[in-house]
Each structure stands twice: as C-alpha cells, then as structure tokens.
C-alpha cells in the first residue's frame, strides 16, 4: 500500500499539477514578457499634463482614471502606465477594481520607466521637531495631530532604518486559570495579573492608555502579540485587554509606547491624545527623513467576492501587472476584535494590510518589484486568486509576512489555486511580528513555489497550512460526540481559525480520521522545489525552515536546500499533515551532533533525501507519526565522529529501511545498524561512504561503486543542484566559496 500511495503522490498528483503549472508559467510569460503595449500613459510625481511622454500626469489616481476612460471607450489592447523616477506619496489607499480589469488576453501594466526606480510610499515625513527638556534635552517632539484613529501608527523609520518603539523592562504576566492548556477559557485571553519586579513603576494608568500596548509571547514561544490595554486596576494589580491574546495570558511581557520608557537613544513614543511624537535620535538631532506610515495598505486590487459555494457572482479583476516598482512604508498590522487568525495567529484572514494586496484577482503579475522598509506584509492574495504570479522580486525589512496566499476557510469553496511564487529573495521578514514567515500558503492549492531564497527570519521560512481537527468541536457536539482533543480546547469566540470555518458545508464521517477532514483542506497539490531556506528562528522557538500542518493531500517538497537552523527541524510535517512527499532535499545541520533534519508526523513519505550532520526523527506532541509512513533511501552523513542518526523512530519497522548511515568512525555507524536491526528496522540499511562524485563542488551523483546505487537511492545531480536558489544568486555558487562541504555559515 505504501508504494502505491507514494507512486500516486509522485506520479499521479505531479502529472496533474504539472499540467496546471504549464498553464501558470505560460500565462506569466505571456503577461510579464509582453510585446510592446499599444497604449502608453505616462505619470510623474511632478507632472501636471495629459499623460503623454512629454506631459505626464501627476498621480496614480489620474493615470488610473485615464486607463478607465480608455477601457470604457472600448480599448481592448494592452495599456502600460509608465512611472517615471520619484516618490509617489499616497494619502489614501490606491484602489483598482473591476473598472480597471483588463480584457481577457490583455493586461494593464504599471511599470517603471526605463532606468527609473519609482517608489510608492504610504509614509509621511515628520517635520517641525523641537527639543524638549526630557532625558537631559535628548528627546525631541513633533506635532502629528493626524496620527489618531485609523492613522495612528505603530512603527517609525529613519529613512530605511526601522526605529525601536519605547519599551519597558520586562513585567511578569499571570492569570487565574486553573487549566494549564494554552488555549484555555476565553476570559483568560483578556484578563491578566501583573507583577513589577523591583517595583519600578513600569505599569500605571496612563492618561493615553489607549496608545499603550503589551508586547510578548502569551504562554507559547512560537508567536508574539501586540495587545492594547483596555483598563488597569492598580490596587489589585490586574488588567483587561481591548482584544484577546492568542492564548491565555502568561509569561514575560513588555510595555510599549509609553513616554515613561523612552530612555534609550533611537527610541520613540506616540501620544495620540496630545498629537505628539517623541523621539530620542542617536545622532543628537532628528534627520530629514523620519517617516511615519499613515496607511495599512498602499494598493488594493479588488474584485467582487461571492462567499457562496457556487461563486456565481465572483468577479475577479483580471490582468493587472506591477513591474519594476518599489513599495515602502505601510503601518504594522493592527489587530481588532473582528479579526480571524490563521494558524497560531501567524497572520489574519482577509485582512486589510500590506504594501500590495490582491483580493479577488486572476492573471495578475508582480514582477521585479521591491518590498522594503515597512511594518506590514509585502504582498498578499486573499480569497479568489488564480493564475497569479509573484516573481523576480525582493522582500526586505518587513514587519509582517513576505508573500501570503490565503483562500477561504475549511468548506467547499476552493478558489485560491494555480498561482506561482518564483525566483524571489526574502530577507529579514517579520521584524515586528516575529512569527511572520517569508512565504505563507493557507488554504491555497496547486501552486508552484520555486527557486526562492528565504533567510534571516525571526521564525519559520516557508509554511503550508490549514485548520487542525481540534477546532471542529461545534460539529462534534452536533454529532453527539465528545471532544477527543482535550489537551487543546479552543473556546467559542476565540480568534484563531473559528470564524473562517464554513460550518454548514462540513459533514464528518469520523471525528478522528483525517480523511474526513481532507476534502475541506485546500492547501493541496503544491510543489515546493529548488528553494534555499536558511538562518531562520532568530527570534522565536519551535520553528522550521519548511513547515506543513493541516493541509490537503499531494504536496511535494523536493530539491530544496535548508541549513543554519539553530533548533527544531529543517523540514517538518506537523499535526494533521498527511500524504506529503519529501524527496531529494539537502538538509545541513548546524547544531551537531543532534541537529534535526527531517521531522515526521502523520502519514508521509520521506525518501531520497541527503542529510548532512542532521538526523531523522518524529514529532512527540500532538498526533504522532503513522507507522505506514516511509523513511527510506535517505543518506544520513556526519562529517564528525559524534553523531545521532535518528530519534523516536522505534514505532517503525519495514518502512524504515534502505538508508545509508555514514560517520568517519564507521564502526559507530555499524553498531548503530546492528541495534536497529534488533528491532526489525533498517534491515537493508548499511553503514558506508555513499561515494559522491564531488561533494565539495555540490555534485551528489554517485561513483560507479557507490552502495547507494544497489539500494536504489536516486542521485541529486550537479545540474539539479545548480537550480537551487534564486537564478540571480544561485546557492551553489556561494556554497563552493567556502572551504569544504557541507557549507555552514556563521
């Protein structure tokens, strides 16, 4: 049965997906590499003309309206809006809707003029600074009367540098809950007690309490929250939040945005009640480019969304292209009581946030753009999203997620699919919301995520997920069934996932078998290949380079390289992750001898992978590994004498087999196999040098006498290794600059 399932994954699903992807790739080529547009509209920040080359228009809105006139008059050819050099400052979100949709087969392209770098900005320069007598006259103040309500900002930049908001010393947060599970009762996500170590007066009833936030990790260290305070009882040292925390309150927190704690050069605080911004510049005087973001989203391309299954009134915007443009300065995501959280609140569902947001779109392209210096997400595709592409772009210094594709919640509406994320560089994404991944695929399927370079992440690099079984308690109750996941109880009214589930469309034959849930999980048939993911988990814990949970069948993780991960597995299938083929990946450990390479839960197939100084293991919390899973034909190679080849694999028997284990102390590897075979595991596995052709040059083909050939292990050829990473900066070219292999940077 295992072989048939694996063949189905690697052959059947792949053939179907490849056919879909051919369509996506061809669509991208037709649009991004378009022939010269017949109609040109020119725009310049200093313009005041008619849109001609000689007399450009002055704003994006004017250019959009010009295009609308042309389309309304029947123009069906391509239209290029040419953006000249300069900064296009937005005072409100720039919206493209169905009136701006291109006819089928055509595009409307917002494109940089030749040799130009147009910048679209949601920021405003803060001027009029005056010195105060605070902190020995080191703190300056500026009037920002507009910075309240929706324009209250949560981040500030000195040109390209994200400045630190005033932050207190840590306080200890507690609650009165007797239940120790991290979800707990709803009220304990709002109510909290606090301790002030040393009685330093860290927390008090400020007159602008609505501006103050608690920052920290409620109960678990795989996420952070920014939580506005509704009220404080100083006598009893208790408080209440204005919005719920992800989990019950508890742990170390910090008070942010109080003038009381503006005590370090480089910090700032905003008092919206007085309309004053305070700042302690490191240089002694505020620079000329102190920028405050005043928008949550800079540009939104929005069709009409029909929430019904049939979607007869779904009308996506077609054929909008952005090329060669830089996007900067949106505010950090603001959470509200109406938000619906994606897994662990790692982002919010259908949220008005991001530098560039597509909501109900098809055949749209983001090509050769830069998303930089912002508190928000880079680009996100919500709800209906088909045949859209993000390629050849750079994401850097963002407070939120780099690229998000987020469909509808579990149910029968599956319309976020067949998209492409190709050849992008994502660095230092999640600088504010530390848990934000570089790429996040939620309830979105049949996508190609290929040749991206993701690194310097606060948490995980690349995620595919949906909603776990433990959230479906309302259906269990309707069925007269008890709750089988008592360790994880999620109360009614919780933010995470519940509001996105399409309850009336779901019918379960079994509340424990994943096969009953799978039809409603639309993150299926994705191909993740040739990506380079490294140096993640720089701020949080329990994260991974590539991570999967609660998705549909048929995802393929192949020919990626992952390395420099301080803890946790490089590639991990977590709770409710099934029928994933993890194959031909290169995993390089950095915490010898117990670096985690591949971590398996569920029914999955880990075959033909190369693990250097990293081990195989299974997860121990939540659902565990299915014994029908496969750990076969992998090479586990240690370059030092200390090695741990795998952990917690005792439940396996014949499906843990035909692996090669190598250690310079070959006797150690041989003894390991002898012990394994006592448990009827690794019966055909061997301890041997796999005899790569030239490991130091990245050629993992096998020499003629390699024992891997006899075991049927597939080689990863030099030609395939050269494809890994961004095409403009391939991984191997950097790797071979280091002496020896595997390459582990510092």
Q: Which residues fall in each region the model found?
A:
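The right-handed parallel beta-helix/beta-solenoid scaffold, focusing on the short coil/turn
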Residues: 39, 77-79, 86, 92, ...
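Extracellular polysaccharide-degrading/modifying enzymes targeting complex plant/algal/animal polysaccharides
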Residues: 42-372, 411, 472, 480-484, ...
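C-terminal motif of bacterial Sec signal peptides marking the signal peptidase cleavage site
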Residues: 18-19
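Bacterial N-terminal signal peptides that target proteins for export
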Residues: 1-9
């Amino acid at each position: 049965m295992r072989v048939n399932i694996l063949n189905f994954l690697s052959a059947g699903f792949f053939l179907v997906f490849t056919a879909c992807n051919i369509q996506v790739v061809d669509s991208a080529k037709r649009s991004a590499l378009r022939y010269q547009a017949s109609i040109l509209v020119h725009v310049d920040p200093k313009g005041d003309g008619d849109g001609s080359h000689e007399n450009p228009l002055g704003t994006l809105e004017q250019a959009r309206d010009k295009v609308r006139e042309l389309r309304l008059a029947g123009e069906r050819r391509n239209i290029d809006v040419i953006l000249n050099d300069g900064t296009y400052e937005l005072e409100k979100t720039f919206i493209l809707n169905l009136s701006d949709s291109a006819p089928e087969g055509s595009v409307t392209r917002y494109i940089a003029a030749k040799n130009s770098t147009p910048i679209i900005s949601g920021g405003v320069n803060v001027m009029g600074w005056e010195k105060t007598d605070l902190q020995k006259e080191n703190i300056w103040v500026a009037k920002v009367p507009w910075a309240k309500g929706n324009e209250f900002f949560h981040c500030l930049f000195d040109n390209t540098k994200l400045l630190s908001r005033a932050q207190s010393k840590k306080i200890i947060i507690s609650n009165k809950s007797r239940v120790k599970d991290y979800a707990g009762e709803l009220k304990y996500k709002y109510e909290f007690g606090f301790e002030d170590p040393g009685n330093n007066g860290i927390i008090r009833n400020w007159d602008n309490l609505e501006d103050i936030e608690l920052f920290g990790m409620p109960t678990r260290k795989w996420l952070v929250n920014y939580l506005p305070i509704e009220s404080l009882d100083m006598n009893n040292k208790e408080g209440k939040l204005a919005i719920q925390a992800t989990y019950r309150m508890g742990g170390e927190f910090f008070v942010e945005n109080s003038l009381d704690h503006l005590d370090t050069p480089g910090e700032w605080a905003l008092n919206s009640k007085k309309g004053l911004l305070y700042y302690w510049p490191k240089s002694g005087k505020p620079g000329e480019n102190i920028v405050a973001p005043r928008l949550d989203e800079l540009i939104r391309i929005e069709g009409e969304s029909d929430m019904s299954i049939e979607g007869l009134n779904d009308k996506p915007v077609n054929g909008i292209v952005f090329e060669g443009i830089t996007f900067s300065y949106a505010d950090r995501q603001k959470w509200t009581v109406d938000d619906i959280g994606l897994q662990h609140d790692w982002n919010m569902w259908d949220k008005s946030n991001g530098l560039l947001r597509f909501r109900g779109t098809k055949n749209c392209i983001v090509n050769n753009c830069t998303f930089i210096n912002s508190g928000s997400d880079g680009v996100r595709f919500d709800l209906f999203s088909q045949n859209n592409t993000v390629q050849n772009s750079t994401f850097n210094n963002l407070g939120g997620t780099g690229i998000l594709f987020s469909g509808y919640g579990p149910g029968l509406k599956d319309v976020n699919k067949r998209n492409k994320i190709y050849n992008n560089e994502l660095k230092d994404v999640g600088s504010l919301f530390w848990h934000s991944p570089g790429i996040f695929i939620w309830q979105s399927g049949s996508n190609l995520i290929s040749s991206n370079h993701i690194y310097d992440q606060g948490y995980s690099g690349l995620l595919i997920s949906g909603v776990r079984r433990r959230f479906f308690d309302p259906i269990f109750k309707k069925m007269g069934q008890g709750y089988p996941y008592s360790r994880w109880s999620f109360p009614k009214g919780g933010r995470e996932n519940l509001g996105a589930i399409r309850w009336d469309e779901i019918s379960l034959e079994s509340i424990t078998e994943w096969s009953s849930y799978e039809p409603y999980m639309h993150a299926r048939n994705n191909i993740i290949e040739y990506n380079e993911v490294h140096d993640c988990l720089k701020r949080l814990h329990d994260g991974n380079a590539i991570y999967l949970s609660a998705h549909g069948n048929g995802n393929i993780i192949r020919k990626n390289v992952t390395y420099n991960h301080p803890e946790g597995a490089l590639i991990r299938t977590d709770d409710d992750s099934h029928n994933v083929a993890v194959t031909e990946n290169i995993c390089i450990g950095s915490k010898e001898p117990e670096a985690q390479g591949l971590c398996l839960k569920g029914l999955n197939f880990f075959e033909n992978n190369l693990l250097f100084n990293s081990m195989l293991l299974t997860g121990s919390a939540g659902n565990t590994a299915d014994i029908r899973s496969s750990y076969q034909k992998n090479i586990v190679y240690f370059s030092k004498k200390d090695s741990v080849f795998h952990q917690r694999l005792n439940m396996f028997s014949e499906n843990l087999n035909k692996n090669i284990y190598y250690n310079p102390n070959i006797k150690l590897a041989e003894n390991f196999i002898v012990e394994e075979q006592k448990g009827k595991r690794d019966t055909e596995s061997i301890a041997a040098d796999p005899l790569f052709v030239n490991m130091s040059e990245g050629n993992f083909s096998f020499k003629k006498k390699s024992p891997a050939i006899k075991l049927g292990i597939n080689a990863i050829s030099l030609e395939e290794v050269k494809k890994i990473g961004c095409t403009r900066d391939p991984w191997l070219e950097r790797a071979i600059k280091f002496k020896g292999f595997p390459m582990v940077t510092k």
